[in-house]
Amino acid sequence: MDTQSTPTLHDLPFRAADFSTLSEALDYAAQGETGANFYTGRGEMYATLPYAELRTSARVLARKLLGMGLEKGDHVALIAETNPEFLQFFFACQYAGLVPVALPASIKLGGHAAYVKQLSGLLKSSQAVIAMAPEGYLTYLEEAGEGLGLRMIGTPEAFERLPAADVAFPESDAEDVAYIQYTSGSTKFPRGVVIRQRSVMSNLAGIIRHGVKIGPGDRCFSWLPFYHDMGLVGLVLVPVASQTSVDYLDTREFAMRPRQWLNLMTQTRATISFAPSFGYDLCARRVRPRDLETYDLSNWRIAGIGAEMIRPETLEHFAEIMGECGFDRRAFLACYGMAETT
């Protein structure tokens, strides 16, 4: 992977998600220079993944998955940690005609046992055939998958060692299943919702054209988890479908160092970023007077807010403090998303 971040400005003619499938969207984005960039909690970029490289690696991985004897429509469970490998597996499934299922990369209250129980329930309900987890989550996933008959549970490195099949990719169209998105589970156990290519592409077009009105010069930034609607649809798929570069900070790193969000918004000159109310509240409470001198948030034109109750006092507090750094309170944009309505 490159060590220089992907550019904001580029020469590829802009298209606002006017594609039939996600793989078609990536095929087009890969003709340009934009892509995804990943940062540590200390604000250092550790990986960059141009869409051209994402396409190449996803297609290689897709042939490895097909080499396992998987068939079109089989479900692939993916622990959705914020890293390049998740993007590669998600789009490998698109090319291979498989259905990715993003699973949470968070150990909630209750620790090991509760997380394993949660994963086990999700693996069962999703009817996954294989499952991938980064090294730090592998033991949890292996324990959760015991007795479920999965063909393989492994790390990205383990899947990379598989032989590739010399086969043509299956035909895909707008009626194919793109992925399975689990509901938030706010009131009961999360429910898997089947998202078809036609639905997700329509949703992406609406967001790009009418929601945030993305255009040349825009750049996205996100610390949202890849297994939630706002993170996956809004800040993974929207950038691909609009040929827009995006910068990522892991959710856990944000929770430990919330000011890094503002540092990286300043550094990357991102124009679009979303968060629930608590994200804005956490930043406003943690920021120090001396920090304000180092921020320049004048580029931030869309500050999306949603996923939980929107509290006006939280937004007012954030806008008042960050106004010193060039933040425009008119950037706030309420958003609403549900897996059931994608």
What kind of feature is each model-predicted range?
Residues 83-108, 121-130, 218-219, 237-247, ...:
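A short helix-loop-beta submotif of the ANL/AMP-binding
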Residues 43, 112, 116-122, 127-174, ...:
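ANL superfamily adenylate-forming
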Residues 34, 162-182, 188-189, 199, ...:
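Conserved pre-ATP/AMP-binding loop-to-beta segment of ANL
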Residues 201-219, 229-271, 286-290:
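Conserved AMP-binding/adenylation subdomain of ANL enzymes
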Residues 1-49, 53-68, 72, 96:
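N-lobe entry segment of adenylate-forming
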Residues 80, 101-121, 135-137, 244-265:
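ATP-dependent adenylate-forming carboxylate-activation enzymes
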Residues 265, 270-274, 286-342:
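Gly/Ser/Thr-rich phosphate-binding loop
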Residues 37-88, 108-115, 171, 195-198:
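Conserved AMP-binding/adenylate-forming core of the ANL superfamily
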